[in-house]
Amino acid sequence: MEGPEAVQRATELIEQRLAQEEETEKLRRSAPGKLSMDMLVLEEEKRLGVQSPALQKVKGQERVRKTSLDLRREIIDVGGIQNLIELRKKRKQKKRDALAAAQEPPPEPEEITGPVNEETFLKAAVEGKMKVIDKYLADGGSADTCDEFRRTALHRASLEGHMEILEKLLENGATVDFQDRLDCTAMHWACRGGHLEVVRLLQSRGADTNVRDKLLSTPLHVAVRTGHVEIVEHFLSLGLDINAKDREGDSALHDAVRLNRYKIIKLLLLHGADMMAKNLAGKTPTDLVQLWQADTRHALEHPEPESEQNGLERPGSGRETPQPIPAQ
């Protein structure tokens, strides 16, 4: 292979490698942004997971690609495939660093003078400003103060993972199962944020781990949709109802399959999730597997609990990636 064909093949390999690495990185680092409070948010979370453009790529949407063959050849000739991969990764990291720097809140003042209003108090719960929280509560403010969406400081701090603020709010009487306008509690928000330590703290203060939002989603549903494996594993260790269904009759396994959460699928199966459970559309998890989900279909058809643990293949198993199996 030489000339244009070699360049084309090399470019395809680059893009495949980058897509794989970006997918892995996004799943590992996924930190949900601030969510607008309407029913569309919950419905989109159910269908796509929180902010999951990577999922759309897996489903077959093509990225916009440069078409200049000369440009491709020049790029590859500069330093080879690996150098190009590293260069593009560094550029992406620089963009992430610049974005993080722009979003970083201003430093907290040494001393809070004057009263703290409700808006400032709620904003402090997001930004982790403990002194503002202390001042508001010391002046007699309610720990259950909420905004127009009934989101409290406890909800906000749970999403962000601010443990010290959470403990302070709970010590000052914050209602641990306070429901916002979508019936989400701090437990739901902690699952979205991916903070296992927050889940454990809320649980130790009596939070309901089976509470439902307006989609009838449990915290387990939310953890599955947002891809937080450790939280899913924690809930399963508690013996929660693994087959609990939401408003559309979907179990956690339905959601995991729909979003191609491979490790979570394996975890659910190893803990006895019902593969034959039907949702309101009459579909089982296996029915939802798309052709592009070869690994997922294999997991459903060959659970192999004796050789799998925590969603990972046994070291040295040597099992090849299964080929797609057409849906029946």
From Swiss-Prot:
For this UniProt record, the keywords arranged alphabetically read as follows: ANK repeat, Cytoplasm, Nucleus, Phosphoprotein, Repeat
Any keyword Nucleus?
Answer: yes
Q: Where are the ANK repeats?
A: 116-145, 149-178, 182-211, 215-244, 248-277
- Kindly list the places in or outside the cell where this protein is found, as annotated in its UniProt entry: Cytoplasm, Myofibril, Sarcomere, I band; Cytoplasm, Cytosol; Nucleus; Nucleus, PML body
Location of the region described as Disordered in the Swiss-Prot/TrEMBL record: 96-116, 297-328
Top-level lineage group: Eukaryota
Q: What is the name attached to this protein's record?
A: Ankyrin repeat domain-containing protein 2
Q: Which organism is it from?
A: Mus musculus (Mouse)
Q: What is the lineage of its organism?
A: Eukaryota, Metazoa, Chordata, Craniata, Vertebrata
